[in-house]
Amino acid sequence: MEKEFKDIVCQILKNSNFIKMDESIHHGNVSTYKHSLLVAYLSYLFVKKHNLKNIDIYSLIRGAMLHDYYLYDWHKKKEGHRFHGFRHPYFALKNALKVFPDLNKKERNIILRHMWPLTIIPPRYKEAWIVQYCDKKATFHDYFSKKKRIKK
């Protein structure tokens, strides 16, 4: 991984709640921790590969890292986690603001709008569009990782 990317994610990777996300499965056999890191890295690579200008890399990566910072096992429907796909962006933002109260408007928008079109309101910023695209790409990766595991 590039130094620029590592320098931005290091503060978040040290957070104890973020570390605990490695214990909860997101999709397939991939933890929420690994999924979030993958989304952030794919978003970073997307910007670099396409040589996009006027992208706030710092906000892009931080928003991507925190987009699924909801801190619960969404598979446990009986614990009140119904409609997870619609609701978790709000829980993720609420939790992220407790630890990172300095989140800017782009980072907040990335977290809140990454589930578009499921959550109806589209992203507002280029950075949020990139993250929501890379989140879908990472989810397919997570899903097919599960399929590979089953075939073995």
Regions found by a protein language model. Give the residues of each.
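Metal-dependent phosphohydrolase cores
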Residues: 1-152
